Amino acid sequence: MSASHSALVPAWLTAPAEANELVASVWPSSAHRVADGSVEVGGVSVFDLRDRFGTPLYVLDEDEVRAHARRARAAFDAAAARHGIRAHVYYAGKAFLSTEVVRWVVDEGLAVDVCTRGELEVALAAGADPARLGFHGNNKSVSELERAVEVGIGSVVVDSPIEIERLAAIAERRGAVQSVLVRVRTGVHAETHAFLATAHEDQKFGFSLEGAAEAVARIRELSSLRFVGLHAHIGSQIFDSSGFRESAARLVDLHADLLAGGEIPLLNVGGGFGISYTSVDDPKPIEEIAGGIVDAIADECAVRGIPMPDVATEPGRVIVGQAGITLYEVGTVKTVTAGEDLDRTYVSVDGGMSDNARPALYGADFSARLVSRTSPATPALSRVVGHHCESGDIVVDAEYLPGDVTPGDLLAVPATGAYCFSLASNYNYTPRPPVVAVRDGRARVIVHGESIDDLLARDAGIPASAPTKTPHGDTE
């Protein structure tokens, strides 16, 4: 049996003639090979990145982030303009948040969506206008809500009856009237991983359709709260607008019923727009998705003879995902017999599930390329794994890499701009890597990496006077 037809190889993965191509739909648009076969991103060599900042290393292409932010805003603005309404595009900060990224997306005209006190403080530290922040979360604490009202946050997406009462009391004490949206479970089952689907009934977020109507009625009774719209988020890594259209129909039904109680200026359809992680992933263009969503809302409003509200959306992954790569150095390489006389090469790198939890958490597929050189070697079925003491520490489950990959080579995994840094951990006492932004041939740290000393400093059993000897990896 050939490897290309074995159980070791996903149905979508085929053996290439050579394993050097950087697939355009997966990599940042600035990524390319230079004369010696190595890769540059944002005009910066992977060798320079390694030498200055070490590995593993998160690399984020600033121009790519900005371009995707502009594209998302333009897509929804154009779709909304066709129907004489406005679009409000919020960057979903949970995908990747730092002060610099907040500044980039705000520069490009986006508002920002946060879901914890920490994310709120990052956005504020970046200089974001609180009035252009939205606050999500199924279990916001009293202190989180106090802080949100204190700074004048634009909107709070309420998620439970308890939160409504809690927020109303806080706003009343402060003499404020807080704008709120009500998060709704529309019952739409998104075509995605179970942990990424968020609008079906049996999960922690939001109100049922019936419960949402009761929540709105209660909010309208409270003088310290202002109901401004409904919100629904059907999931993440979704490739077309069909699920959004179905969700929109149910939202508009509820919206129409609620109009009897007063004007409702906004309908927020959430985010979750997918990107390509491998060469076979084929998400619809954001322009097509935006048009499908907004047109669906327009159609549903027309059927019911009601005015169309403004539309809000919350893209995250589609803004930063393709803009990021993670750079690793190969440590060991070994080939094992995986059954039926089939071999698999295990390529171990100096990172792993501590810097990319998505394969372990969601079974997510990624791709990888040798980026320190090209190779004429026959591609070999490979699995890229990390250095952690865990069998599930898999970075790329199945990939064809050159058969001559060797210790010291540099590998890069593309499309790691979203939910890699955000989900990073210190598993096995591993310091989290720095994040470096590249643009126009220059690289700069936007999030400092951790050192062993940083981790040891949290251990209360170590005397404060103990010497420290381990430097940060991001020395510039």
Per-region residue spans from a language model:
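A charged N-terminal "starter" segment
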Residues: 1-178, 222, 226, 441-476
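Active-site loop/helix belt of alpha/beta enzymes
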Residues: 2-22, 81, 186-337, 401, ...
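General structural feature for long, well-ordered alpha-helical segments within catalytic domains
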Residues: 45, 61-64, 68, 72, ...
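Conserved, mostly hydrophobic/aromatic
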Residues: 65, 94, 116, 148, ...
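Structural preference for beta-strand elements that scaffold enzyme active sites
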Residues: 88-90, 109-111, 130-134, 155, ...
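Active-site beta-loop-alpha junctions enriched in small/polar residues
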Residues: 92-98, 117-118, 138-140, 159-161, ...
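Short acidic, glycine/serine/threonine-rich loops at helix termini
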Residues: 101-102, 125-126, 145-150, 167-170, ...
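Charged (often Lys/Glu-rich) extended helix/loop segments that serve as interaction or gating elements
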Residues: 298, 302, 306-476
